[in-house]
Amino acid sequence: MASSDSSYSRKFLLITFLPLSLACLAFLLQWRSGVNDSVTQWFDDNYPFPGMATVSEKRSLRSDSSCVSLLGQSRTQAFPYLRDLKLDHKPDLKPRICITTSTSAGLEQTLPWIFYHKVIGVETFYLFVEGTAASPNVSRVLETIPGVNVIYRTRELEEEQAKSRIWNETWLEKFFYKPCNYELFVKQNLNMEMAITMARDAGMDWILHLDTDELVHPSGTREYSLRNLLRDVPADVDEVIFTNYESSVERDDIKEPFTEVSMFKKNFKHLPREVYYGNYKEATRGNPNYFLTYANGKSAARIQDHLRPNGAHRWHNYKTYPNIKELDEAAILHYTYSKFSDLTSRRDRCGCKPTKKDVKRCFMLDFDRAAFIIASTSTSEEMLQWYRERVVWTDDNLILKLLRKGILTRIYAPMVIIQELREAGVFSSVVTSAHMSLSKNRSNSSTSSNY
């Protein structure tokens, strides 16, 4: 009887655990990519999503300033979540968001800027390019990126913009026919006006104007998503304002601000009044103002009839006064003067005389004026000393105090996203793909000419 019970028990256990064992085996095989299903078949590469890699898996940042190191090492396979670098946003993903910018930056700045904003939900980019950005080696790469529209400053463009109604409006007239920053400001508005038309024709829902040293920080949203943020905006709101935070660099040898800067000074609008005014002097550190440059943020506007730019930071409407909402948490991260070389690059773009009188004709902000004079009249050693005193944060005790007060804050999300994109080979793959496409076209052209 005991033998019979023992045999029965073994059979019962076998019948019970065999299906469970087979189910576990099937799960393990599928998890190890031994079996493909409708989900895993699209993500069969072994690259992690941004932020999933362990510390031991992360490679240290290279310290050299070459374009190759900044764009990352090339890989044969593209980042799986970008699927061959297309990052196509289907029209049914609402709202559809676009960004317009006027830039002369190189690929080491524009590629991280573009793909970061693609990750958080931006679909289309209108890049009005000049200088380095318009050079063949840069522009031909930008033109290969889906969703990126490259607009050159041609004679035809200037003739078209000369007909703009902006020239007859009073709200911008004080900036007309002045050099340097004033000229750029007018160009930005003319470009924004053209971008509105292109965005409407493309069926966009929202438009932002950003510089390529600015990143949207959609803090407080689900999945760190700009699309989710704008989707939740009430239907009667025409425009939302992002306050800006300003980069606070802790070294004078920053090469790639987006992945080397994590500390920012918060806008006074996101601070209690007593904290802001009580620590103003220490937070300013002898500079003309609380922020080195602008403090009025940037805004996003719904694409609608009669929309117009209202300076580089706002939008307006020719027919009605827009209903505007200020966002409580989301911000624009402004990486201003985050590299020592920014002093000379800004100087080289302007032909003003380095005098206190003339710089007022060329620059709107006090810090820009002071920086231009220093960069134009000082030795490299004097410039570096000035930069360390005015821009770089080196007092650990002061940093700790202002972090505790909430004036300074650490923000890591953009750094993580961009570094993971770089380590996945996204930026270098774009460059390689563009060069291969160019070589192929040249080869085909050469072959055709032989017949």
Curated annotation (Swiss-Prot):
Family matches, as Pfam families: Glyco_transf_92
UniProt GO MF annotations: glycosyltransferase activity
Leader peptide range in chain numbering: 1-23
Organism in which the protein naturally occurs: Arabidopsis thaliana (Mouse-ear cress)
One cellular component term from this protein's GO annotations in UniProt: cytoplasm
Described purpose of this protein according to its UniProt entry: Involved in the coordination between cell elongation and cellulose synthesis by promoting the expression of genes involved in cell elongation and cellulose synthesis. Acts as a regulator of plasmodesmatal permeability. Maybe a glycosyltransferase.
Sites where a glycan is attached: 36, 137, 168, 441, 444
Entry protein name: Glycosyltransferase-like At2g41451
Subcellular compartments: Secreted, Cell wall; Cytoplasm; Cell membrane
InterPro entries attached to this UniProt entry: Glyco_transf_92, KOBITO1-like
Main location: secreted
Top-level division of the source organism's lineage: Eukaryota
Entry annotated with the keyword Cell membrane: yes
Enzyme class: transferase
